UniProtKB/Swiss-Prot annotation:
Source species, domain of life: Bacteria
The gene coding this protein: pth
Stabilizes the basic form of H active site to accept a proton (site feature) positions: D93
Biological function: Hydrolyzes ribosome-free peptidyl-tRNAs (with 1 or more amino acids incorporated), which drop off the ribosome during protein synthesis, or as a result of ribosome stalling.
Locations listed in the record: Cytoplasm
Binding residue positions for tRNA: Y15, F66, N68, N114
Stated name of the protein: Peptidyl-tRNA hydrolase
Gene source species: Streptococcus pyogenes serotype M49 (strain NZ131)
Family matches, as HAMAP family: Pept_tRNA_hydro_bact (MF_00083)
Subunit structure: Monomer.
Positions annotated as active site in the UniProt record: H20 (proton acceptor)
InterPro entries assigned to the protein according to its UniProt record, in alphabetical order: Pept_tRNA_hydro, Pept_tRNA_hydro_CS, Pept_tRNA_hydro_sf
Similarity field: Belongs to the PTH family.
Keyword Calcium: no
Length: 189
C-alpha cells in the first residue's frame, strides 16, 4: 500500500510564513525527524519526498502549482503511483475555524477553499481525508486575501506551533494505525 500526505500552500519565500501555507508548514514539521529529502518534480508540479513507515511507502507532497491549481498535482500523483483516494490526506488552512483549532474530516465540501475546490474538481469526489487548521476570520476592514496572505501574530504563532505538533502526531498515529476514523476520534476537538 502507498500513502500520500499533501500539504497545501503557495511556492516561494514570499509566501513561506503566510497563513495560507499552513499545509506546507505541517509537511515540513512532519518530515523533520524522518529521513526525507524533497525534490522539485516539474512533471508533477510538486515538491515530493518519500520514505517507508511500517513497511509502507509514504509520499509527502507540496504542490508547486499555487493554491488554486493544487488538484493538478494531486490527481497526477494519485494516478501515477496508483494511490487509492482512501490513502490520501490533505492538510490545509480553514478561515471558518478559530486560530489553531484542528479538525479532521473524511469528506466534505470545499467550504470556499480554492485549493480544495481544485482537488475535488480534479479527482472527482469530495470524499477524501483532510486535516484542517483554523486560521480565523479576517479582522474588520481586512480582505480575505490580505488575511490568508498575512502572517500570524506572535500570540497566534505560539498557538499554531502547538497545533502543528498535534498535526504531526495525528499523521504519525494514522500512519501507524492505518485507520483515519480512529485518528479522527483521537485528534478532533
Amino acid at each position: 500500500m502507498v500513502k500520500m500526505i499533501v500539504g497545501l500552500g503557495n511556492p516561494g519565500s514570499k509566501y513561506e510564513k503566510t497563513k495560507h501555507n499552513i499545509g506546507f508548514m505541517a509537511i515540513d514539521n512532519i518530515v523533520k525527524n524522518l529521513d526525507v529529502t524533497f525534490t522539485d518534480d516539474k512533471n508533477f508540479k510538486a515538491q515530493i519526498g518519500s520514505t517507508f513507515i511500517n513497511h509502507e511507502k509514504v509520499y509527502f507532497v507540496k504542490p508547486t502549482t499555487f493554491m488554486n491549481n493544487s488538484g493538478i498535482a494531486v490527481k497526477a500523483l494519485l494516478t501515477y503511483y496508483n494511490i487509492d483516494i482512501t490513502d490520501l490526506i490533505v492538510i490545509y488552512d480553514d478561515l471558518d475555524m478559530e486560530v489553531s483549532k484542528l479538525r479532521l474530516r473524511s469528506k466534505g465540501s470545499a467550504g470556499g477553499h480554492n485549493g480544495i475546490k481544485s482537488i475535488i474538481a480534479h479527482i472527482g469526489t469530495q470524499e477524501f481525508n483532510r486535516i484542517k487548521v483554523g486560521i480565523g476570520r479576517p479582522l474588520k476592514g481586512m480582505t480575505v486575501i490580505n488575511h490568508v496572505m498575512g502572517q500570524f501574530n506572535t500570540e497566534d504563532n505560539i498557538a499554531i506551533s502547538l497545533t502543528l505538533d498535534r498535526v504531526v502526531n495525528a499523521v504519525k498515529f494514522y500512519l501507524q494505525e492505518n485507520d483515519f476514523e480512529k485518528t479522527m476520534q483521537k485528534f478532533n476537538g
